[in-house]
């Protein structure tokens, strides 16, 4: 009889009670050809420990929030103090005001902010607000950019970069996505064509300023500025989805790096310090349309709850300390440089890149440009799966998809990074 691991046993049990055995599809490890995911028992610093007591260097960080590492002592202490005073009030609390003030202080283009419970809620609310403010219905999103699982975002571009929305999940009526237009990331011609065809109907463009849901694809020079310009020319709003990049690639998010001003910004992940949270914010004149100040409805039972707000406040306090992002960037660059040098030493088709505490791994030559979702699909996805399995078996926990970015924390040590590079070097040598 086969000896099964505790993770295998738990996964089999989970599938009896939870669809697919997980509460978010990527966690099942299906996209990397694994039979079962690893069930985690606890985490500390840069490490995960599974139910079989295997230890992993974690480069997912709960998909981005754990920029301080797991179980940061200061964040835990702040949460524990708040727990004694209540978990949720269903009423306003001072922590909401304090976190809002901190976000507005640090993010260059947010004058007012509203808290929700997830990134999906944030993007849904931002789109509703943009439509109400402009009195228009159509939105533009980019192929490969993910903005949550709301019906209007579950759209693929079909056979071309320029298309009317077609749902790519059962249960999404075509009527729901008929106003979702899809363009190709880094392709201004597709954007211009959409504005020419639907000039006075487009409420907004929503974009990840750095596309972290098709690995990690940077905007080409001037792309974001051109989006800003075409929105201005057509009285449309520009929304930056910084759920992933906000407080992760820089203290002021990607918008502070590229110096482009969105009208609205969505946030999540880091601002909750590991607790469920999302937010949307922007120009005051737009945000004043949100109920109860204005007519655009948005509400949430647990929105602004004191536990999430407390975790967020302490996290932002720590990452806003002088030198934090310099140190984080050095760690990410050391990892990326080491991986690139290892691949080059064995003439292996691979390259990596990073910004702040976020990185991307591409299984193709660095001479091949990866600027779009289509480009990413042409890389060696099968080799990524082999790399993932090898690293996992040797104690390195990477994102279980070639389409996901990786994350490093301030808790990762030089030894962690060196071990990761050495393992990758061995893989490149053997393959």
Curated annotation (Swiss-Prot):
Enzyme class per UniProt: isomerase
What does it catalyze?
A: (S)-4-amino-5-oxopentanoate = 5-aminolevulinate
InterPro entries per UniProt:
4pyrrol_synth_GluAld_NH2Trfase (IPR004639), Aminotrans_3 (IPR005814), Aminotrans_3_PPA_site (IPR049704), PyrdxlP-dep_Trfase (IPR015424), PyrdxlP-dep_Trfase_major (IPR015421), PyrdxlP-dep_Trfase_small (IPR015422)
> Is GTP-binding one of the keywords?
no
Gene3D superfamilies registered for this protein in UniProt: Aspartate Aminotransferase, domain 1, Type I PLP-dependent aspartate aminotransferase-like (Major domain)
What EC identifiers does the entry list?
A: 5.4.3.8
What Pfam families does the record tag this protein with?
Aminotran_3 (PF00202)
The organism's superkingdom is given as Bacteria
What GO terms are given for molecular function?
Answer: glutamate-1-semialdehyde 2,1-aminomutase activity; pyridoxal phosphate binding; transaminase activity
Entry GO CC: cytoplasm
Can you tell me which residues the record assigns to a coiled coil? none
Which keywords, in A-to-Z order, does the entry hold? Cytoplasm, Isomerase, Porphyrin biosynthesis, Pyridoxal phosphate
Mind telling me which residue stretches traverse the membrane in this protein? Answer: none
The answer to whether the entry has keyword Isomerase is yes
- N6-(pyridoxal phosphate)lysine is found on 269
CDD domains hit by this protein: OAT_like
Pathway, per record: Porphyrin-containing compound metabolism; protoporphyrin-IX biosynthesis; 5-aminolevulinate from L-glutamyl-tRNA(Glu): step 2/2
Q: Where in the cell does this protein reside? A: Cytoplasm
In terms of NCBIfam families, this protein maps to: hemL, PRK00062.1
Q: What PANTHER family does the record point to?
A: GLUTAMATE-1-SEMIALDEHYDE 2,1-AMINOMUTASE (PTHR43713), GLUTAMATE-1-SEMIALDEHYDE 2,1-AMINOMUTASE 1, CHLOROPLASTIC-RELATED (PTHR43713:SF3)
Question: Which family, according to UniProt?
Answer: Belongs to the class-III pyridoxal-phosphate-dependent aminotransferase family. HemL subfamily.
Extract the HAMAP family matched here: HemL_aminotrans_3 (MF_00375)
Subunit composition? Answer: Homodimer.
Could you tell me what this protein is called?
Answer: Glutamate-1-semialdehyde 2,1-aminomutase
């Amino acid at each position: 009889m086969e000896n099964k691991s505790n993770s295998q046993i738990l996964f089999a049990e989970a599938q009896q009670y939870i669809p697919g055995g997980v509460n978010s599809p990527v966690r099942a490890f299906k996209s990397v050809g694994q039979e079962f995911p690893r069930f985690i028992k606890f985490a500390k610093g840069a490490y995960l420990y599974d139910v079989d007591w295997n230890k992993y260097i974690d480069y997912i960080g709960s998909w981005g929030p754990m920029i301080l590492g797991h179980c940061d002592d200061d964040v835990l202490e702040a949460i524990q103090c708040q727990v004694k005073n209540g978990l949720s009030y269903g009423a306003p609390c001072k922590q909401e005001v304090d976190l809002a003030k901190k976000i507005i202080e640090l993010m260059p283009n947010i004058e007012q902010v509203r808290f929700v419970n997830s990134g999906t809620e944030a993007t849904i609310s931002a789109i509703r607000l943009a439509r109400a403010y402009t009195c228009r219905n159509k939105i533009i999103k980019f192929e490969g950019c993910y903005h949550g699982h709301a019906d209007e975002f579950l759209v693929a571009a079909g056979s071309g970069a320029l298309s009317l929305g077609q749902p790519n999940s059962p249960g999404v009526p075509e009527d729901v996505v008929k106003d979702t237009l899809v363009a190709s990331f880094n392709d201004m011609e597709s954007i211009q064509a959409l504005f020419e065809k639907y000039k006075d109907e487009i409420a907004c463009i929503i974009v990840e300023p750095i596309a972290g849901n098709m690995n990690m694809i940077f905007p080409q020079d001037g792309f974001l500025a051109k989006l800003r310009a075409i929105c201005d020319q057509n009285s449309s709003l520009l929304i930056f989805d910084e759920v992933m990049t906000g407080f992760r690639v820089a203290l002021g998010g990607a918008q502070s790096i590229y110096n482009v001003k969105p009208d609205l910004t969505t946030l999540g992940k880091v601002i909750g310090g590991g607790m469920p949270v999302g937010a949307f914010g922007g120009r005051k004149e737009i945000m004043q349309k949100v109920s109860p100040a204005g007519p655009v409805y948005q509400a949430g039972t647990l929105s602004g709850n004191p536990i999430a707000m407390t975790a967020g406040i302490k996290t932002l306090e720590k990452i806003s300390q002088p030198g934090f992002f310099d140190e984080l960037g050095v760690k990410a660059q050391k990892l990326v440089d080491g991986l690139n040098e290892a691949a080059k030493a064995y003439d292996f088709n691979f390259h990596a890149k990073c910004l702040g505490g976020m990185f991307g791994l591409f299984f193709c030559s660095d001479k091949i440009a990866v600027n779009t979702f289509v480009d990413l699909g042409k890389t060696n996805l099968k080799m990524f799966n082999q790399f993932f399995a090898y690293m996992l078996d040797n104690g390195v926990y990477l994102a279980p998809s070639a389409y996901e970015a990786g994350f490093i924390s301030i808790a990762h040590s030089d030894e962690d990074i060196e071990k990761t590079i050495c393992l990758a070097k061995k893989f490149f040598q053997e393959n």
